[in-house]
């Protein structure tokens, strides 16, 4: 696959997306139902919903810029498991957020706050699934990403099923990663682009220690990791944590660090073998993802445009519309269990 002549077309694709009123939404992104741009304004049900959401995100972001990577991970964890139906927001003993892969998820507080505000203004109208998509868009835009169009009209799912969480380990190979993304209707460009979200945020040392001390049971670090990075991470991540000790956190992109800025430095780090997670470094082991990585490392605007398209595609996976699902009154519980 050749991408050399593809990237100049991304701007046209994003512009055409912004100019359309609807987008197909489901597995493979080709279903019989549709999402609508500015759904709540178009249907005259909550004209200022997106304005309310943006205002709350701005308030939170000014106090804590880490909400950008937190919301990105939260949205990914929602959309990639049974689609973008807000089910990751549900609480309960068997909810998706209790799955091991979702340990350390954040961003719930801001979603709950936004929902409270919208319920006071437009009760029973704006779905939690749409709130999560719109809030994520606004937060990452504040961090430096493009403000891509978010098509709305999603409804909320009501299934609590931790066993359904099939999010892969961050230590998988590029072939395994690509197979997972393809199973969700996404492609190698989407995968390489969405992994660029690791340009900000943190990860637990437990996801990195195998690369630092005993890669593939060799008793040695991952030979693809820059030796300086190995030393830096070993200082922060012990080979094992004792009972009762917390699992330390390290930055996914030390170049961004606490600023949580959306940049293309992630791709430069991959090329120089300074990726923290194996799944990121593995991008060089596939011809297509390597070519895309090289392009994004040298062309930030190409990355920004591709990110806008990939987020729109991910946000359209297996959505509920029409009479399917419900509009939750409280994002943490289904209406049947709300007690209101």
Curated annotation (Swiss-Prot):
Q: Give residues annotated as binding Ca(2+) 2.
A: 199, 255, 258
What PANTHER family does this protein's entry cite?
PEROXIDASE, PTHR31517
**Other remarks?**
There are 73 peroxidase genes in A.thaliana.
The entry's free-text remark on the cofactor is: Binds 1 heme b (iron(II)-protoporphyrin IX) group per subunit. Binds 2 calcium ions per subunit.
What is an annotated GO biological process for this record, any one? hydrogen peroxide catabolic process
- Catalysed reactions, as listed in the record: 2 a phenolic donor + H2O2 = 2 a phenolic radical donor + 2 H2O
Q: What does this protein do?
A: Removal of H(2)O(2), oxidation of toxic reductants, biosynthesis and degradation of lignin, suberization, auxin catabolism, response to environmental stresses such as wounding, pathogen attack and oxidative stress. The enzyme activity has to be proved.
**Record's subcellular location:** Secreted
Which controlled-vocabulary keywords does the entry list?
Calcium, Disulfide bond, Glycoprotein, Heme, Hydrogen peroxide, Iron, Metal-binding, Oxidoreductase, Peroxidase, Secreted, Signal
> This protein is called what?
Probable peroxidase 61
**Is the Disulfide bond keyword given for this protein?**
yes
Keyword Transcription on entry: no
Q: Which residue windows are coiled coil?
A: none
Q: What is its EC number?
A: 1.11.1.7
Tell me the residue numbers annotated for binding heme b: 198
User: Which residues, renumbered to this chain, are glycosylated?
Assistant: 63, 226
- SUPFAM superfamilies xref list: Heme-dependent peroxidases
What positions does UniProt annotate as the active site of this protein? Answer: 73
What GO terms are given for molecular function? Answer: heme binding; lactoperoxidase activity; metal ion binding
Q: Which organism is it from?
A: Arabidopsis thaliana (Mouse-ear cress)
Cofactor(s) listed: heme b; Ca(2+)
**Signal peptide bounds:** 1-25
**Residues involved in Ca(2+) 1 binding:** 78, 81, 83, 85, 87
């Amino acid at each position: 696959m050749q991408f050399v002549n593809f990237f100049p077309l991304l701007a046209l694709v994003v512009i055409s997306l912004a100019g359309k009123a609807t987008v197909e939404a489901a597995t493979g992104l080709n279903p019989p139902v549709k999402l609508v741009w500015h759904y709540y304004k178009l249907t005259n049900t909550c004209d200022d919903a997106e304005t309310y959401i943006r205002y709350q995100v701005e308030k939170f972001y000014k106090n804590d810029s880490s909400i950008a990577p937190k919301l990105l991970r939260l949205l990914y964890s929602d959309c990639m498991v049974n689609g973008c139906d807000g089910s990751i927001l549900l609480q309960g003993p068997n909810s998706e957020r209790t799955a091991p892969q979702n340990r350390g998820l954040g961003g719930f507080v801001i979603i709950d706050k936004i929902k409270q505000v919208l319920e006071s203004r437009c009760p029973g109208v704006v779905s939690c699934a749409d709130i999560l998509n719109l809030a994520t868009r606004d937060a990452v835009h504040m961090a430096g990403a493009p403000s891509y169009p978010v098509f709305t009209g999603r409804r909320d799912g009501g299934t609590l099923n931790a066993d359904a969480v099939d999010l892969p380990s961050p230590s998988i190979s590029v072939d395994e990663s690509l197979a997972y993304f393809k199973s969700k209707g996404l492609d190698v460009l989407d995968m390489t682009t969405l992994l660029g979200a690791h340009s900000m945020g943190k990860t637990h040392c437990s996801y990195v220690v195998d690369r630092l001390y005993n890669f593939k049971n060799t008793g040695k670090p991952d030979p693809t990791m820059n030796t300086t990075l190995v030393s830096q991470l070993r200082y922060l991540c012990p080979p094992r944590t004792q009972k009762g000790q917390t699992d330390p956190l390290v930055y996914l992109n030390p170049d961004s660090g606490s600023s949580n800025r959306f940049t293309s430095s992630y791709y430069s780090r991959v090329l120089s073998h300074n990726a923290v997670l194996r799944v990121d470094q593995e991008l060089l082991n596939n011809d297509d993802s390597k070519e895309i990585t090289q392009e994004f490392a040298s062309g930030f605007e190409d990355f920004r445009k591709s990110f806008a398209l990939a987020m729109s595609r991910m946000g359209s996976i297996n959505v509920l519309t029409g009479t399917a699902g419900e509009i939750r009154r409280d994002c943490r519980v289904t209406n049947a269990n709300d007690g209101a």
